[in-house]
A protein has these predicted regions:
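Conserved SAM-binding loop
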Residues: 92-93
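S-adenosyl-L-methionine
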Residues: 97-146
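Short catalytic micro-motifs in class I SAM-dependent methyltransferases
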Residues: 139, 158-165
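A short glycine-rich, Lys/Arg-flanked "PGG" loop and its adjoining helix->strand segment in the class I
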Residues: 150-151, 171-186
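Acidic carboxylate diad motif detector
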Residues: 192-194
């Protein structure tokens, strides 16, 4: 995911639902396939291999997206979702608590069931919800590490697109990457999806 279209991600007037519907659910088919279809297929292959599993996973992905958690919920007892913006946390919790105004992720459930070869879409969504142990705000992320009181050590850190969005320079990218993995256990796994224009 290119970072330039999302340069206003951290602005105060950021619209969480509009962001999702533009890039992840109601946009052009080619964009949806790049941002949703491709990661889901890759994550299915990774998690179904059985090599990435454990007690806890930390997700630090862009926006209030949920599709990356479907395959992960098969392999981890607890999943922690971390965000920087109140708007995204509020919108994510609408889906989590089945509230009115939440993004309709039915197409993700259907795609996941097709990939996994299963039929019960409702059961899968409930499995994801039950595995989410916390939705946590990372306060002042630019200047502070992840709060060790809020997030335990985890077996896997999963991040889709976020580093590309918040890192304006190579140095910022390296600093943010260290922060993202600060709660990762020794021997744990990092699953990272980046934009094509990220300078490494």
């Amino acid at each position: 995911m290119a970072s330039s279209p999302h340069k206003h991600y951290l602005d105060e007037d950021f619209d969480a639902k509009e962001f999702i519907e533009t890039y992840f659910s109601h946009g052009k088919i080619s964009i949806i396939e790049e941002h949703v279809g491709f990661p889901m297929k890759v994550l299915h292959e990774v998690f179904s291999s059985g090599k990435v599993r454990g007690d806890a996973l930390l997700d630090i992905s862009v926006g209030a997206i949920i599709y990356q958690l479907f395959s992960a919920s098969n392999n981890f007892k607890k999943m922690y979702v971390m965000e920087f913006k109140d708007a995204n946390i509020t919108h994510f919790k609408k889906w989590l608590q089945k509230e009115e105004g939440a993004t309709d992720w039915s197409f993700v459930s259907e795609k996941f069931c097709h990939i996994e070869g299963i039929r019960d879409k409702l059961q899968e969504k409930d499995q994801v919800r039950k595995a989410i142990a916390g939705v946590i705000k990372w306060e002042n992320f630019e200047n502070t590490p992840i709060d060790t009181q809020l997030v335990p050590e985890v077996d896997c850190v999963l991040s889709l697109w976020m580093l590309a969005v918040i890192s304006k320079t190579k140095e910022a990218f390296q600093t943010n990457l260290k922060k993202f993995t600060s709660r990762l256990k020794i021997g744990g796994r990092l699953l990272l999806f980046l934009g094509m224009n990220v300078l490494l």
